[in-house]
């Protein structure tokens, strides 16, 4: 057996000089860990980082809108989280109680994460743009014992509570009947949690249906995040910034566990409203960020800027996650800064599963290779394993042995039966691999377009569309057709300076004919102002398909829609 402390010290060493052989050794050590009694804050954050690098900066925070900023060492962040935990306990919270969290990017968000894990509570991070109705749905599915919010979102949570009586805490300002979080002692004993104890629940934003509640344990994210850290490549010496909303699982992956696993410095930048991309990249430059993670939506916006204004002298690592990043975006960033954006793949239900490791040659358009902690298999519709390159199949995870980063399950048993079948966890996504074992994302199972006898993955068509100079964003869906079953339709957001017209649509189609097989070229193009997205930046193609169904029922055509 290896102790938790020795394991993570070895992992920190590995991160400083990663290679494939050492990664395999790390994976073997995971199997030797005794995690029956495990509290990540006690065993890793405090026993390693606070003790051994307590004076090192753990968090640098800035608010773009207000100009506020803060810097906290590992020791200071530990004291802050202990005060939060003492306060929660004073108000009657105990192990297993449910704490909903809806806050902006703020130092207290990190402190609450630490306090909840240390205290053995069940945390439910929630997106800051959720409505009262959406919060009511969540509260009805999993009743809160306490809610924590900021002054901008408190009213939404309060109204959603209705007649529910719970403890309410505010991270900033004052509000009647709400409590402050830092009134108590900075001494707080850890709860003696077990590895199988539930500590985090997420309601997935989802591209289809109602949100699903995903249940994670005291080890699945806290220890499983070594996969994310090793793919992102974050090191002890890094200033690591992850552009993510606090309610997204990727915040837990990349703003919390991954950098704090290795003793790095986390950078948190808060902004309200629409992302000011120029200003945000200016902060990346001014703060001297060395490791930067952002969703594809942001990267696509970044490359529309005048990139000559930026000098990222310290930036060494850039990664993307959420949906596959289009090769054209990777090329533009590489040409300008000599930095390759490395793509990776994971879910709220897991940690990072497939990725372009720092030591791996990047193939633009590929999401990389599977992490050895996950036994990834592609299965056909009959459940048989696909062994030939370029055949599209369901992305699944072999359950024997069960990966440490995999969630416990859904709260919905029907969904569990659909997803856990015959020894595999079905992700709901489809992909193929090439002759070198690199994986390529095709789409959600229901996103794949069936036109005549062909199957078309939306990502490939969207990537081709982005190569046209007028296209800022694109989403591709299948729309009903009596002859071909479905037609390929492209929704396009134009860059500034371009106006919708049939001539431009024809020009884009002509460009597509040089890049795609004829059956993949969109037969319908509609120009729109924006695309519907989840809180994590994923395109909601299901919403676009619903729009198409409604339009066809009514016999309507879009204002800037062109059929060929």
Curated annotation (Swiss-Prot):
Gene3D superfamilies assigned to the protein according to its UniProt record, in alphabetical order: 3.30.300.30, N-terminal domain of ligase-like
Binding site for substrate: 348, 455
GO molecular function: acetate-CoA ligase activity; ATP binding; fatty-acyl-CoA synthase activity; medium-chain fatty acid-CoA ligase activity; propionate-CoA ligase activity
InterPro entries reported in the protein's UniProt record: AMP-bd_C (IPR025110), AMP-bd_C_sf (IPR045851), AMP-dep_synth/lig_dom (IPR000873), ANL_N_sf (IPR042099), Mitochondrial_ACSM (IPR051087)
Binding site for ATP: 204-212, 343-348, 429, 444, 538
Annotated CDD domains: MACS_like
Highest taxon of source: Archaea
Listed transmembrane segments: 105-125
Example of a GO cellular component annotation carried by this entry: membrane
Protein known as: 4-hydroxybutyrate--CoA ligase 1
């Amino acid at each position: 057996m290896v102790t938790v402390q020795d394991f993570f010290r070895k992992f920190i060493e590995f991160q400083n000089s990663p290679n494939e052989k050492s990664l395999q050794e790390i994976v073997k050590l995971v199997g030797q860990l005794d995690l029956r009694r495990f509290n990540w804050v006690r065993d890793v954050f405090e026993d390693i980082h606070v003790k051994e690098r307590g004076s090192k900066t753990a968090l640098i925070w800035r608010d773009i809108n207000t100009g506020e900023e803060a810097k906290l060492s590992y020791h200071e962040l530990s004291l802050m989280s202990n005060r939060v935990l003492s306060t929660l306990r004073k108000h009657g919270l105990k192990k297993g109680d449910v704490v909903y969290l809806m806050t902006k990017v703020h130092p207290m968000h990190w402190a609450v994460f630490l306090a909840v894990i240390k205290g053995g509570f069940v945390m439910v991070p929630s997106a800051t743009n959720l409505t009262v109705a959406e919060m009511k749905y969540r509260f009805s599915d999993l009743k809160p014992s306490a809610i924590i919010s900021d002054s901008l979102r408190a009213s939404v949570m309060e109204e959603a509570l209705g007649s529910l009586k719970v403890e309410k805490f505010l991270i900033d300002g004052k509000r009647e009947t709400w409590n402050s979080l830092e009134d108590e002692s900075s001494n707080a004993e850890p709860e003696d949690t077990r590895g199988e104890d539930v500590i985090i629940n997420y309601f997935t934003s989802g591209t289809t249906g109602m949100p699903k509640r995903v249940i994670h344990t005291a080890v699945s994210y806290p220890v499983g995040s070594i996969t994310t850290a090793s793919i992102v490549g974050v090191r002890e010496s890094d200033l690591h910034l992850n552009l993510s909303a606090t309610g997204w699982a990727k915040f837990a992956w990349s703003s919390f566990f991954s950098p704090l696993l290795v003793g790095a410095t986390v950078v948190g930048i808060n902004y309200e409203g629409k992302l000011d991309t120029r200003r945000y990249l200016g902060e990346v430059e001014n703060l001297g960020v060395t490791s930067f993670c952002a969703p594809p939506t942001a990267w696509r916006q970044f490359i529309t800027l005048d990139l000559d204004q930026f000098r990222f002298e310290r930036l060494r690592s850039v990664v993307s996650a959420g949906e596959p990043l289009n090769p054209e975006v990777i090329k533009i960033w590489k040409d300008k800064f000599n930095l390759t954006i490395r793509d990776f793949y994971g879910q709220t239900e897991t940690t990072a599963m497939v990725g372009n490791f720092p030591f791996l040659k990047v193939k633009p358009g590929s999401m990389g290779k599977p992490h050895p902690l996950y036994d990834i298999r592609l299965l056909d519709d009959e459940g048989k394993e696909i062994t030939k390159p370029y055949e599209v199949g369901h992305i699944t995870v072999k359950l024997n042995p069960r990966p440490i980063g995999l969630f416990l399950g859904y709260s919905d048993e029907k969904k569990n039966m659909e997803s856990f079948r015959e020894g595999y966890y079905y992700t709901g996504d489809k992909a193929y691999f090439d002759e070198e074992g690199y994986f390529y994302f095709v789409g959600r199972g229901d996103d794949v377009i069936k036109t005549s006898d062909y199957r078309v993955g939306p990502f490939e068509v969207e990537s081709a569309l982005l190569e046209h100079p007028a296209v800022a964003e694109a989403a591709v869906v299948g729309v009903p057709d009596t002859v071909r079953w479905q037609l390929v339709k492209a929704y396009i957001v134009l860059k500034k300076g371009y106006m919708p017209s049939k001539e431009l649509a024809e020009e884009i189609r002509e460009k597509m004919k040089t890049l795609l097989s004829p059956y993949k070229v969109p037969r319908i193009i509609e120009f729109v102002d924006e695309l519907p997205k989840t809180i994590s930046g994923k395109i909601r193609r299901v919403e676009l398909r619903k729009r198409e169904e409604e339009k066809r029922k009514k016999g309507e055509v879009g204002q800037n829609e062109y059929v060929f």
